[in-house]
């Protein structure tokens, strides 16, 4: 009964966001046979127009559909949850597309990655498989096993070489058990990636500026 009561309390507070004065959060909770362990990961990269609405006050005056958008707040944790002596780097749903989601977790000693996701709104489209492909990329980039667990999309284990194991069909109940290896190494990507981002962004800006200058010089008067 105590576990059921705790589950109900956490569900109301963290999932429904109904606790007075508490923000809405998309949170992954660590739950064991002893109940909620008080450890969670709050999604840091929340989805615009779904989990939150940019320029909400303005858009609400324009469209009645604005009320359907969520009002979630992003988290600021390191993305690591301790699980049975391991350290899981958690990226919720499409949070895995952001470079820093896995990199930051690895910097905080994550030795495998978990991607819990819903996918219900994707239907039978290829978005589920796009997310799975991005998870493959992260597995190779960071040299970590990735476990994708979906409520309705494709679940799978992905080894550090990008191989997909035990992939499940869409909208079918399955379970799978597999032993995975834990890694502590850091790849070159974990160190170089932030600098490469800055370099290519700077180059892109310079190319745009150069194109504008060149266009103005070559502009033919009408």
Give the location of each predicted region.
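Generic structural signal for well-ordered beta-strand positions
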Residues: 37-39, 165-166
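A short loop-to-beta-strand structural motif that recurs across blades of beta-propeller domains
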Residues: 27-29
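Active-site beta-loop-alpha substructure in enzyme catalytic cores
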Residues: 62-136
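C-terminal beta-strand edge segments of enzyme domains
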Residues: 53, 138-221
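Flexible, solvent-exposed short loops/turns enriched in glycine
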Residues: 46-66, 121
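Short, acidic, Ser/Thr-enriched surface-loop or helix-capping motifs
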Residues: 31-33, 158-159
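Short, solvent-exposed loop/turn segments at conserved positions within beta-propeller repeat blades
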Residues: 21-24
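Single conserved hydrophobic/aromatic residue that forms the stacking wall/gate
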Residues: 1-11
């Amino acid at each position: 009964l105590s576990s059921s009561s705790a589950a109900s309390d956490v569900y109301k507070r963290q999932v429904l966001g109904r606790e007075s004065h508490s923000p809405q959060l998309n949170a992954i909770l660590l739950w064991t046979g002893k109940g909620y362990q008080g450890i969670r990961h709050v999604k840091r990269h929340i989805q615009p127009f779904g989990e939150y609405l940019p320029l909400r006050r303005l858009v609400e005056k324009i469209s009645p559909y604005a009320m359907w958008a969520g009002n979630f707040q992003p988290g600021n944790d390191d993305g690591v949850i301790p699980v049975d002596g391991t350290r899981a780097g958690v990226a919720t749903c499409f949070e895995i597309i952001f470079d820093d989601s896995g990199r930051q977790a690895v910097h905080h000693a994550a030795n495998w990655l978990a991607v819990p996701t819903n996918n219900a709104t994707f239907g039978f489209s290829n978005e589920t498989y796009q997310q799975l492909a991005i998870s493959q990329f992260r597995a190779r980039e960071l040299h970590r096993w990735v476990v994708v667990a979906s409520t309705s999309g494709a679940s799978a284990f992905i080894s550090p070489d990008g191989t997909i194991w035990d992939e499940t069909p869409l909208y079918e109940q399955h379970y799978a058990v597999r032993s995975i290896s834990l890694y502590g190494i850091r790849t070159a990507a974990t160190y170089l990636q932030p600098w490469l981002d800055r370099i290519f962004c700077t180059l892109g800006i310079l190319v745009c500026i150069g194109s504008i200058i060149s266009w103005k010089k070559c502009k033919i008067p009408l």
